[in-house]
Amino acid sequence: MDAATLTYDTLRFAEFEDFPETSEPVWILGRKYSIFTEKDEILSDVASRLWFTYRKNFPAIGGTGPTSDTGWGCMLRCGQMIFAQALVCRHLGRDWRWTQRKRQPDSYFSVLNAFIDRKDSYYSIHQIAQMGVGEGKSIGQWYGPNTVAQVLKKLAVFDTWSSLAVHIAMDNTVVMEEIRRLCRTSVPCAGATAFPADSDRHCNGFPAGAEVTNRPSPWRPLVLLIPLRLGLTDINEAYVETLKHCFMMPQSLGVIGGKPNSAHYFIGYVGEELIYLDPHTTQPAVEPTDGCFIPDESFHCQHPPCRMSIAELDPSIAVGFFCKTEDDFNDWCQQVKKLSLLGGALPMFELVELQPSHLACPDVLNLSLDSSDVERLERFFDSEDEDFEILSL
């Protein structure tokens, strides 16, 4: 199995193509580039995103479960990538760049440690898979974009260093009042006893010397995830321009989705092609050294990223945004409102101030969903299910 996987992955690396020579701008997570004058900057931006792929020979999930996620963990890895981008923006900033063999700040290794393949890392494959069991997903079962978003939201409660407000907008509706209420609420640590002792905290998200308190903050940084279905079996062309504009926003975290049972993390576009990081490469698991230093080169894509036609995108996706401040959120709202002015384009979701009366009013401070709720949402959004709503065809 390993030999076949390695052979397949070697072929995949040989197939990567350079960017096309085009006057079309390249958009990467809110940044605009020119192929002709900024190619090195494009590749540096791509290489600075955390790239999570299949891994093998990690500690068994649940003690007796799988030691590799090859063949089933691609959407989980994409969920890790979009969430890692939120943590990078939170702790390092969007303009931070990774350089091979250059010393990085401690906060970088703290972010990376939160995703290492072991049971005590906040967003590890172990935590995601085991949290998914509580939501009706057996270990080794494929996730849709909504399911992984729901699981990551629950895991974020334990990450008091990042102190994120995670909101998943359901029913294709983003309610501004709900988000403001959530982000202005201080949430105490819910998982202080769920992770190792203080001496191990640096390996799980807390940098050495970090101060973690429950002091109220005027605005907790927002991770906004919006699961969507943009067509029946293919993406509706009327959504394409709106989708492109999502990658232009400075708050963009990208998109998770891809093709049925083959997930990708989309970070931008050029012309009519999406740019993405592909998790379908199996690499050996990485263990931090005694000083919590991580050999990190395998977590960065150092070749031109993959591209695919937007028309090939499976219509089941989740779009992500990060708003570090309330001003960022207000700016994002204004940009979304302007999208309605795009000629011939359909909005992918609705932005409203208050909860519409025809929708049940959720408890926005409830940080978990029961399994029946998750099962209902999963049936609605996951691409493998045929019972879904069609948006504005």
From Swiss-Prot:
Function text: Cysteine protease that plays a key role in autophagy by mediating both proteolytic activation and delipidation of ATG8 family proteins. Required for canonical autophagy (macroautophagy), non-canonical autophagy as well as for mitophagy. The protease activity is required for proteolytic activation of ATG8 family proteins: cleaves the C-terminal amino acid of ATG8 proteins MAP1LC3A, MAP1LC3B, MAP1LC3C, GABARAPL1, GABARAPL2 and GABARAP, to reveal a C-terminal glycine.
Record-listed N-acetylmethionine modification sites: M1
A UniProt-annotated Pfam family: Peptidase_C54
Natural source organism: Homo sapiens
Family in the record: Belongs to the peptidase C54 family.
Listed result of changing C183S: Does not affect formation of disulfide bonds
Main localization (coarse): cytoplasm
Disulfide bonds: C292-C361
Protein name, entry field: Cysteine protease ATG4B
Effect of S316D: Phospho-mimetic mutant; reduced hydrolase activity, leading to decreased proteolytic activation and delipidation of ATG8 family proteins
InterPro entries referenced in this protein's UniProt entry, alphabetically: ATG4_LIR (IPR046793), Papain-like_cys_pep_sf (IPR038765), Peptidase_C54 (IPR005078), Peptidase_C54_cat (IPR046792)
Keyword line: Acetylation, Autophagy, Cytoplasm, Cytoplasmic vesicle, Disulfide bond, Endoplasmic reticulum, Glycoprotein, Hydrolase, Isopeptide bond, Mitochondrion, Phosphoprotein, Protease, Protein transport, S-nitrosylation, Thiol protease, Transport, Ubl conjugation, Ubl conjugation pathway
